[in-house]
Structure formats: structure tokens, C-alpha cells
Amino acid sequence: MESKKKAIYVHGLGSGAASTTIDIVRKVFSDYEWTPVEVNEDPVDSVNIINHTIGQLHPALLMGTSLGGLYLMYADMDSCEDNAIRFIFNPACDIARVIRETIGFGTKEYFVPRLDGIQEYVLDESVCARFENFIAGYQPTSGKRDYAMFSIKDELIGPAGVRNNQRVCYEAGYRILLDWEGGHRLRCQTLRLSRTHLFDERKTKYRVGDRVLFKTSEPGEHFLRYYGEGGPMDPRARRKEEFVGAIKSIYLESTPQLYYAVTVAPLSSFYCSFVSEKDIMRLATEEDLGRLC
């Protein structure tokens, strides 16, 4: 019998290798042999732990949530299996802000028993500075198949944070996906949708020149023209009705719970000036698109 491919999972802040999320991951991706990696609040130490595990296992799939997603952005992809998939959920790219504004300072208790035996950790200004210095001093690594999924209703990161983190991941080369229903915590349903519509490659790419209908919070239909991978952005097309630009990736997805993001490159004032934080682009149904192509 053929052995299973190796995979690693990296948990979020305040958790550990015994996170209950790994049970969901194992159930949905049962054809992989999963190893949970326990990390901490020190980014340099945590990334070293991840890279040590990668060097031992050479995984074909890397998955991380929240802070674990951020750490995986700096993982040693060269030591992974060739063509490995890196999939991060709600990465906490602005973790220092989240700690200051949402989580708060103080002594915290880990949600689960830890392998290192430590059950409490401290969040303070020095921890925030450590995260900020790490992000400023290191560059995310590049992979061949990098994906980042964001929950639109992420209550921990917040709407502005989600938009900022999408930009960070996009600029790092990730394909951006949206979960329209979930919150910050990874849902089993989100994982199942991801497997069906991402890992099985069940998606349809648009033709160059297609007009793609998307929804915004403003009335009326708005369109984006697909110019193909790496096409130049046209600075003259500064009308809300039609965004013209280089599309990182456009995929058709009619499942109500999961939408592939339509992303204009580069994410800049051109993009942000016409799309408010409420207007995260959402693809229409296949029926709507059929009338346009």
C-alpha cells in the first residue's frame, strides 16, 4: 500500500500541538499523514521549529491558522516536497495590532495542554515589538502553490485588518480566497470546501477579454475585464463600472459559501479608492457570468 504524503499543521496564538483543529484537519485531509507543530510567541524561534520539522519530513502540504499562518509565510519551502501546497487561513499578518487592540496585554492561559509543559504566556509591549521587528526584518518565502483564505466575518482581525492582510499575502505571491460565512476560527465546512474546490483543481479559468461581473455594496452591476496573467494596468480606466488591470487569478466558483477573490494588481490607491472596506469583491453565479461571456 502506498504511504501517505507528509503534512504539517501550525496552530494559532494561545494554542498548541493538541489543538482540536488538527482533528478536523486530519478528518478532512485523511489521505495525508499529519504532524502538528507546536510554536510560541517568539517568531524567530517558532519559524526555526517549523523549518526543523520541514527538514525532517519534507511535507507535501503545509497548513496554518492565524499566527500559525503568519509563521508559515516564512517557512523553508525549498526543503518541502517539490510542488508542495502551502495553505494559510486568516493569517495574523498584523498580530501586534491585534494584541494591542483586541486581545489585550497580560498573563494568558493556553487553551490546550502544551508539549513543552508551559500553561501560561505573557503578552505585553515587548512581545508586540518582537513581532514587528521580525516582520520588518524578514521577507516571506516563495512557494509554487501558495494560497491564503480569509473569512470576511473575521471578528478578531476586523474588516480593515482583513483587507490589509489580503494585500500582504497578495504581494507575497499568494492566491487569495474568501470564506463568506466563517469567522476567525477555522470551520470544518471551510476545509471541506477548500478540498473540493482547491486541491481537486475543480475550477474554471476565464478567457482573456472576458467581462467578469462582481457585486459591491453599491447598486448596479460592476465589471472587471480579464487581461490575463501579468497584463499591464491601464491607469485611464478610473471608472467604478470597469476595473482594468492585471489579474493575479480569476476563478469561477458558484458555491454560496466560498468565493474566489478577484484581485487587481497592484493593490494600490487605484484599487482602494474605488472599493470600500464593505466592497470586498464577490463573484456572481455561473448563470450571471454566462450572460456576459
Where are these regions (language model features)?
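Gly/Ala-rich beta-loop-alpha elbow adjacent to hydrolase catalytic centers
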Residues: 63-72
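Intrinsically disordered, low-complexity, charged/polar segments
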Residues: 252-293
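Short beta-strand-centered aromatic/proline hotspots
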Residues: 222-251
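Active-site signature of alpha/beta-hydrolase-fold catalytic machinery across serine-
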Residues: 74-78
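Active-site catalytic motif of lipid deacylating hydrolases and related acyltransferases
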Residues: 2-57, 184
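The alpha/beta-hydrolase serine catalytic core
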Residues: 84-200
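Short coil-to-beta transition motif at edge beta-strands of beta-rich domains
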Residues: 203-232
